[in-house]
Amino acid sequence: MEEFLDKLPQMDLMRSEKMTLVQLIIPVESAHRSITYLGELGLLQFRDLNADKSPFQRTFANQVKRCGEMSRKLRFFKDQIDKAGLRCSPRLEIEPDIALGDLERQLADHEHEVLEMNSNSEKLRQTYNELLEFKIVLEKASGFLVSSNTHAIGEEIELHESTYSNNGFIETASLLEQEMNPGHSNQSGLRFISGIINKDKLLKFERMLFRATRGNMLFNQTTSDEEIMDPSTSEMVEKVVFVVFFSGEQARTKILKICEAFGANCYPVPEDTTKQRQLTREVLSRLSDLEATLDAGTRHRNNALNSVGYSLTNWITTVRREKAVYDTLNMLNFDVTKKCLVGEGWCPTFAKTQIHEVLQRATFDSSSQVGVIFHVMQAVESPPTYFRTNKLTNAFQEIIDAYGVARYQEANPAVYSVVTYPFLFAVMFGDWGHGLCLLLGALYLLARERKLSTQKLGSFMEMLFGGRYVILLMALFSIYCGLIYNEFFSVPFHIFGGSAYKCRDTTCSDAYTVGLIKYRDPYPFGVDPSWRGSRTELPYLNSLKMKMSILLGIAQMNLGLILSFFNARFFGSSLDIRYQFIPQMIFLNSLFGYLSLLIIIKWCTGSQADLYHVMIYMFLSPTEELGENELFWGQRPLQIVLLLLAFIAVPWMLFPKPFALRKIHMERFQGRTYGVLVSSEVDLDVEPDSARGGGHHEEEFNFSEIFVHQLIHSIEFVLGSVSNTASYLRLWALSLAHSELSTVFYEKVLLLAWGYENILIRLIGVAVFAFATAFILLMMETLSAFLHALRLHWVEFMGKFFNGDGYKFKPFSFALI
């Protein structure tokens, strides 16, 4: 048997790849290039030899800091390009590699240029917005001034009091300079202040002015025609132009302070109509000049950003690679001469030749006089777990890894989950109409695979795309199980001709309840469509699906136990085979394996025996005659033997192994044997990284702890055999729920609406049926069946053999950054 097993071909996914711990001694002059080439290869996971040092104490901390600063500048350029509405269009030609120092200088120059252009543009934009506000104030305030001019004193009162609240506004406006330096002002005459304020502040602003002047003011306001950009916040807001008439220097001071507090911008407006028109022309002229200047600045800035955008993608990749290289170099140690860097890491055994060739090429390309020393080390801790997967198996491997990463070289459940997972899903989801809908969705994802793989997807879409092959297999198995159940959106199809049953005579009026006879062989595949609508439909389908669920569950749990045997055999643990695998197989199959056998015999013979009665009285009255419940000769003695075996298996699981471990431990430390004790149950307090091959410690053997752990493990298996078998009945329950929901939506929505002659009611019925099918049956039910299949694999199947305390192989690879 062992020779036969040894001759079987190796499976890539059955066990993780064999790993090797290697040491690298790299000369300083070729260190950077060597790490770069290893990152391109992506098959070496470095160990951090400076874990006790902070990031700032490491050798290449300054280089990492420089890379971080360059990353910040590149993010700044990316944000500026996005804000400008430009696209990063990388050059088609291959750019030569650029040194880190040269790239750093280029980025600094570009950043300085862009920041300077942004600053100038911001100042010009602020001036433009202020002039725009000034223009609006001139247009709106002139009406108030004309109406008030007839009541004003003959002496012209210019608005030198109307101080402009924004510092240094319009320093060169010739007419404005004249207006700000009037001849003389009557200190007791009527004055005014004009400006503009946000509309949402207007009521509070007016109330504050009224209280500050004790009502001795006249407030006029009008809304601007459109939203304008606020000069201080650069936000589009709705503003209101106001003119405040007052008297006295003290009132002027109070009003200006209130304007400043509320963020109102005050602008000087002359009373004379001619001067207003002249000032308006000057403002419009300056606005036109500023628009031309802003457009030219925007074009110049966009040209500069476009020149950056051509190389931005390559620069981002270069900086990321350089930072990853220096982060990896920080994990290496200098030797005593400070001329070489020493590193350690894990690599797959098959990759040693490739790594050696890469290091030789790095030595040659860097013109180093000394080559890189590459040699294998003796591993103490457990290696990382690495599986070589493809697009199809990767999704199933991720499902398993979500529960726990496999211990180094233990049996991998993902191999079997590729088939069992979609099949158990389909048992719960079996409807070939719904399966076709899932298939169309999976085919759409596969057809757009190349395009979607290069796009940035949302979290939900990314999850769907990553599981596209899982969805494909679930759809195919759902179609298969739906054909077995003979359900197409809950409707049975006569795929293989008519039913095997027909009416006894021509007077048979109800072919679903009475008068049916079987006139030919059973339906060749799937459920006979005549069961649909009959009085015995639910009892028949429930019996079929319940028994099928038990058979599938016992088969999968037995597969899990068989894998535990292969694990124990691979790790050389004969104790686990003799005192764990054998009694567990006996216990499970003496009870539930026997139940599965009875189900198959009953199906084959057509017996009317009550299996509930058989199993219950197998425990309560094992010696009583079975009577009409006897399925085969010798059933009662066989049941007694199986019951005794089940009772014997429990202490077999519990007692021998702890005592055998204590005996081996005592012999080992008495000098009679020096072999390393290898067992999955020896060192209960050992961390996962020392689970295999790390046995040079001399800890005190704690027999009580070993015994308690074995007791818990035995009780858990005994109780779990019952609960896990019952858990597989969810296959029956969810299949029944899915079928009944489909029937309700079909009969109570679609057929009911179709019974009306009104076309509107029919359309509503079709819409409701389509909505219920899509969102309840194809989304909620799919998710429910998916999660239940997940539970059956994680707990019922993997719990029989899977440790899941390993850690992933994470190589240094540029493809992963």
Curated annotation (Swiss-Prot):
The keyword Transmembrane applies. One of its GO terms (biological process) is proton-transporting V-type ATPase complex assembly. The chain crosses the membrane at residues 423-443, 469-489, 548-568, 581-601, 640-660, 759-779. Residues 97-133 form a coiled coil. One of its GO terms (molecular function) is proton-transporting ATPase activity, rotational mechanism. The keyword Signal does not apply. Signal peptide: none annotated. Pfam families: V_ATPase_I. V-ATPase is a heteromultimeric enzyme composed of a peripheral catalytic V1 complex (components A to H) attached to an integral membrane V0 proton pore complex (components: a, c, c'', d and e). This is V-type proton ATPase subunit a1. It comes from Arabidopsis thaliana. The lineage of its organism: Eukaryota, Viridiplantae, Streptophyta, Embryophyta, Tracheophyta.
